[in-house]
From Swiss-Prot:
Residues 1-147 form the UBC core domain. It comes from the Eukaryota. One of its GO terms (cellular component) is nucleus. It is a peripheral membrane protein. Pathway: Protein modification; protein ubiquitination. Disulfide bonds join 21-107. Its main location: membrane. Transmembrane segments: none annotated. Belongs to the ubiquitin-conjugating enzyme family. PANTHER family: UBIQUITIN-CONJUGATING ENZYME E2 (PTHR24068). It is an enzyme of class 2 (transferase). It comes from Bos taurus. This is Ubiquitin-conjugating enzyme E2 D3.
C-alpha cells in the first residue's frame, strides 16, 4: 500500500511539480527522499536553496512522513535539530495530504512564520518584537548556509 502510494506521488510530482519545490527518492530507496525548496521571493530566504529529507513510514499515508531540513535555517518553527513545527506533519495529518502539499505548506511557513507555536522561542520573540532584526539574521543565515 505505502509503496504504491509513494510511486503515485512521485509520478504526480514529475507531472505537476509544486512551485519552487522538488522531491524524489535517494537512490533506490523509495521510503527515503530528498526535497529542495527555493527560498520564496517575498521572504528573507529569497535566493536560498534549502534541502530536506523525507522519510516515509511503512504505514504511509495513514501516518505522516518525517520531514526535516538538512540546510540550516533561522526560523521560529524550525529548530537546530532541523525539526519542523507544522500541524499537518503531526496532529493534523490526513491520508488525503501529499508530499506536494506538505512542501507547499513548508514554503508558506517560510513566508509566514507562526511565532505563537514556536520550536525556538527566542527567534519567535525577535520575530514579534524586532522584525527588521529577524529579517536581517534570516538573510545572513540564508547567505551563509543556503547559497
Amino acid at each position: 500500500m505505502a509503496l504504491k502510494r509513494i510511486n503515485k506521488e512521485l509520478s504526480d510530482l514529475a507531472r505537476d511539480p509544486p512551485a519552487q519545490c522538488s522531491a524524489g527518492p535517494v537512490g533506490d530507496d523509495m521510503f527515503h527522499w530528498q526535497a529542495t525548496i527555493m527560498g520564496p521571493n517575498d521572504s528573507p530566504y529569497q535566493g536560498g536553496v534549502f534541502f530536506l529529507t523525507i522519510h516515509f513510514p511503512t504505514d504511509y499515508p495513514f501516518k505522516p512522513p518525517k520531514v526535516a531540513f538538512t540546510t540550516r535555517i533561522y526560523h521560529p518553527n524550525i529548530n537546530s535539530n532541523d525539526s519542523i513545527c507544522l500541524d499537518i506533519l503531526r496532529s493534523q495529518w490526513s491520508p488525503a495530504l501529499t508530499i506536494s502539499k506538505v512542501l507547499l505548506s513548508i514554503c508558506s511557513l517560510l513566508c509566514d512564520p507562526n511565532p505563537d507555536d514556536p520550536l525556538v522561542p527566542e527567534i519567535a520573540r525577535i520575530y514579534k518584537t524586532d522584525r527588521d532584526k529577524y529579517n536581517r539574521i534570516s538573510r545572513e543565515w540564508t547567505q551563509k548556509y543556503a547559497m
